[in-house]
Amino acid sequence: MPIVGDAKRVLSELTDYFDEKDKVKAPSIKPWIDRLIDLKERFPRGYEEHADGTLAPQYVLETLSKTAGSDAIYVSGVGQHQMWAAQFIDYDKPRHWINSGGAGTMGFSIPAAMGAKAAMPEKEVWAIDGDGCFQMTNQEITTAALEGFPIKVALINNGNLGMVRQWQTLFYDGHYSHTKLGGEVYVPDFVKLSEALGAVSFRVTSADEVEEAIQRAREINDRPVVVEFVVGEDAQVWPMIAAGTSNSDIEYARGMRPFFGEEESAAETPEAINDTIEALEQEGN
């Protein structure tokens, strides 16, 4: 039904109307919350360790969460590290997880972390960045050093534009184009670069170094700290929805997806379960 009238008057009257709390009651979202809890229990977060022994980025963020805790403020850039930070860091306070959502703003984390530190100087602030994002705004490390913002940066370096690489792996048969950011030696040397910009910086390459490095960074509070975590290039973000498909087609892992509604009931019959097992066995052969 259209509302025709002077915008100022109409909006004022609508505001007055809805300000009367007895006019509108918020709908209960408990059924939806219960549904989400059920899905989280049935499809818990997880990741695979890399066969080649390289560091898993999910482990880095999981350890950061356990070490720095939920009282720290976490800010992310854009890409795989953004998704992993959302999944593997435990948040229980409002305004402690800052990112730009789906806006695609590579380079967001360092300036935003500086803003968070300026607003709440008593808080520990971690910028979680990828090697691609970091090269968009790493010069602001100098600003942080000069202006006295001792932020901490967890630099997840997989030597690639990881989210683009994942799409090329899954949907373009592994034909990689313009995603590799280095060769045998990663370029630039992020430790030397960060030190030149006024930060303390060090590199982590194995799982047994992660917690100690994070704790070391937490103890430095007179300047920015950049911790470079060199991780495997083939780690992927799950769950995922392919372009042009419905949210109902979400995949929990490659080739695996949960069922919803009537599909869910049908998929849980013994016949359907046996069919799934047989299909997986044939695929494995």
Question: How does the language model describe each region?
Answer:
Residues 26-31, 77-78, 228:
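Short coil/turn segments at secondary-structure boundaries
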